[in-house]
């Protein structure tokens, strides 16, 4: 059997970015044949990716790309916050955002089929994703994306966990300020008329329950409910919210935009992991189960 040297392991690691021990194992199995070891790693890492695919991805990053009046916003998920800070993972998200903007894929599957390189050759985005899963040992997925075109665009990223793209006409500085405001205050619609009916009904139900508990007469309780709903609508409607940078603490976003002669036509807000049920590990229960299983086997 051929001797496996440190330089051979280093060379294979440089080619594959696989963990050091995995490289050594592959070289040993391939009897020192670098090309064969590389192929073995590719198969092994692919298998590793397959095993990871079923695990929940509730962490990750939001990335954006804007070029003129074309842009994109994308959320790419990972299992842990640690991986979401990995440079290769962040690069994957940024590349995906650019591909969405430039190629307008119909869905995640179509996005994955696009070449990772802008030169249109080499591995696809999906192949790069699977390769990263194999190297890192953690599942990752393209959760959602949106493409924008035909309008002036402004974006704001709060770290890598919150991303906003605003479609507007007028002053770019004002639009960027609004994007930052949206990231901070998280409105659900431009105006109260745009708030989804199901959200209003949910708020009305909660308000009605509170009013019933108050023991007030029916007419007063009804006014309490309506007051709560109207307050909620102002709190979640962008134009009615108090602008986060308002000098007087009173100016609304709508008033600020009017003063800046700027119109916001729409916005998209992504928050990493929003709506995803995260897995909670109960280590005490897990240990207890293992002890019980060991006793049963004894």
Curated annotation (Swiss-Prot):
The keyword Nuclease does not apply. One of its GO terms (molecular function) is translation elongation factor activity. InterPro entries: EF-Ts_dimer_sf, Transl_elong_EFTs/EF1B, Transl_elong_EFTs/EF1B_dimer, Transl_elong_Ts_CS, UBA-like_sf. It comes from the Bacteria. The keyword Zinc-finger does not apply. Pfam families: EF_TS. It is found in: Cytoplasm. Residues 80-83 are annotated as: Involved in Mg(2+) ion dislocation from EF-Tu. One of its GO terms (cellular component) is cytoplasm. Keywords: Cytoplasm, Elongation factor, Protein biosynthesis. SUPFAM superfamilies: Elongation factor Ts (EF-Ts), dimerisation domain (SSF54713), UBA-like (SSF46934). Belongs to the EF-Ts family. Associates with the EF-Tu.GDP complex and induces the exchange of GDP to GTP. It remains bound to the aminoacyl-tRNA.EF-Tu.GTP complex up to the GTP hydrolysis stage on the ribosome. This is Elongation factor Ts. It comes from Paracidovorax citrulli (strain AAC00-1) (Acidovorax citrulli). The lineage of its organism: Bacteria, Pseudomonadati, Pseudomonadota, Betaproteobacteria, Burkholderiales.
